[in-house]
């Protein structure tokens, strides 16, 4: 089966809804998107692994590898989108539409369009004997729980030299990305007496020092 061109790939990806949400009534799987990517990447001689998420058989990550050895370059993105209300769109969100020199559709920018571009760029390497691999990685649930990325990170299977993430950044390459880290601090005081306050330790005062 011949590989579709970039716009045709984008059109097919956008036509498949893959909303992820913490609300079960609107949450969807991403397997159909993963299977599309897998079929195209196999045409380019990538070795493709589809990795179902634990307790979510309708969702999966994908790791596609071209070449051999250690290191290499990862092109990474997510296959899910945020929820959408079709009534708020000027165009059908599940149909790729070109208007005013722009492409409209659910996921054109964030971020199904990235996979069409990455696969198109990989065509020129499909018959190369590369000493370091090119990997294309697709994850699930980035827009909700990050379960896809969490499971992939926990597996420890990605040890590339470089990673490029195709999230939209206003057409300006950036070398960092925001994240989130949560920590908890516990302080325990000890009782004292007004006759000798030095015997005590006030946890409230200690927390004031930490926060301030």
Show which residues each predicted segment covers:
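Histidine-centered active-site/metal-ligand motif
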Residues: 78, 177, 193-194
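Glycine/serine-rich anion-binding loops at beta->alpha junctions
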Residues: 101-117, 193
């Amino acid at each position: 089966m011949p590989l579709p061109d970039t716009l045709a790939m984008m059109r097919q990806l956008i036509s498949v809804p893959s909303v992820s949400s913490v609300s079960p009534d609107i949450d969807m799987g991403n397997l159909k998107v993963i299977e599309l990517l897998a079929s195209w990447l196999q045409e380019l001689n990538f070795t493709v692994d589809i990795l179902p998420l634990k307790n979510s058989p309708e969702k999966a990550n994908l790791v596609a590898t071209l070449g051999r050895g250690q290191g290499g370059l990862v092109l990474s993105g997510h296959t899910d989108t945020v929820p959408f209300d079709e009534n708020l769109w000027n165009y059908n969100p599940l149909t790729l539409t070109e208007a005013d020199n722009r492409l409209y559709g659910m996921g054109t920018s964030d971020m199904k369009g990235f996979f069409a571009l990455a696969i198109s760029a990989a065509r020129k390497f499909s018959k190369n004997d590369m000493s370091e691999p090119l990997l294309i990685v697709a994850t699930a649930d980035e827009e909700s729980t990050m379960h896809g990325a969490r499971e992939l990170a926990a597996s420890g299977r990605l040890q590339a030299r470089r990673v490029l993430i195709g999230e939209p950044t206003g057409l300006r390459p950036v070398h960092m990305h925001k994240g989130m880290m949560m920590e908890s601090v516990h302080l325990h005081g000890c009782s004292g007496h007004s006759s000798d306050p030095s015997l005590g330790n006030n946890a409230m005062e200690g927390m004031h020092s930490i926060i301030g």
